[in-house]
Amino acid sequence: MEVINTLFKLAGTNQEHAQSAQPEPMIEEYFTTGYTPAEPIVVEEYFTRGVSSETIYVKDEEYDPASNWVVPKREEPKSPGPMVWLNESSADNGPNYKRVDRVTGETSLVTRDREDVRKMSLMLMDKHQDMLRGELLNFQNNINKSGSCLMCRKVKCTTVKSPCCGLDFCNTCITVMGRRFHAKNFDINKPMESDLINNESPIKEVPECPFCGNDFFNEDCQFSKIFMRDLLERCENDCGMEQFYIAKLKKRCAKRTKRINKNKRLAKDLSKKISHKIFRRIESEAGKISPGARGKFVANKIRENKGKVDFSVMTQKYYHYSAVDMVRYGCGLSGLTQVLDAEPRLTNGSCKDHKDDGFGIIPVHKHAYTGNFEPAILKLAIEREEFDIFNAVDNELNTVVHDIMNMPHPNGSDKYLPFLEKNVNLFSSVMDQQNDRGYTPRTLAKFGIMSCDKCDGNTCERGRILKEKYNVTV
């Protein structure tokens, strides 16, 4: 009760109002379970009784502004136990974030000592050092291809690769710059000869860092950090900023292109999975419809989902035909891989077993080359002029194939195949010419005139045309 009185004294309320508006036991649950709110709630935004502005963490969905209560301020724990951040994503963004002890339920403010600041600064320095080293390596590989020393630019001097960063320097330049560093006259643009004349100490063959004595370009050496920064400025000034950053930009563009291509590939794979999922659903629904209306149903369903799925990934071929074509002609419901915009426009045949069902669907019987429903598919391709044979050199062969495929019956006689085979020697280049879907005139001849065991030359329109025009007996 004392806690309630304290709460409503802060809010400017009396004892009677306090008894009528008691807080819910949500706060205790919050401090014991370690609930992490998405955003801290500021008291001024929700209370109208003059409570001072103070950031208080509450559970969003159970908070009721009408009850006019606030969270009591808790003291810091004497012995901190296992801590958990109230807002883990923002724990390092400032010193005013709170953390809660899951054992005691107490909260404490986050503070940073000087050791944390020192570690952070060292981490940033190392990151900056790696960036400088990478830029110098990029300059050496793309611009300074002659192998000369990056300091004196003498091609004939003996260059030594530093063991740490892999840059090319000669012993003279490394030693002279070390002397300048000790003399606190670190001028990278000053000629090296002046230092060599005034100093009689010999040049070491093995380059060592003149500051720390370790291998040159030690990661913890301050001399190497200053040296690389000034060296990068000199490289940019000598070769020109434009040339240096062009090489740098090319490297960045290559990484960006690689990242974009990776994202496209991932998006393509995801779209392919979604497309297959939609196709399987369409396939299951179409299986419950009569075969006569199945083709039109599938075509309409595909159009409905065309804006939701990238169908450009569905370009796989199966026996040289699209499975969606096969479905539209009532040939099956498996392996849907491609979307066609145009409706099929096949001509009705006189054969009673191959009549149009009214939806442009011509069922291909099981006896017509089992597993390959090519005749109807090839007829559709001819109507759309998807084959290059119409622009071939020989018009006679084109006329023969065109006449065969334009016959009303989707099946013909395989006895006509020898006639085309006789012309292979004369028109072999035309017979083997493929279009973008993998068809050739030879394929047209082979699968486009398959015989139907229920038809003969007298009752089938296609058989009659073959017999009269080309003297072929069905």
From Swiss-Prot:
It comes from the Viruses. InterPro entries: Znf_RING/FYVE/PHD. This is Uncharacterized protein ORF124.
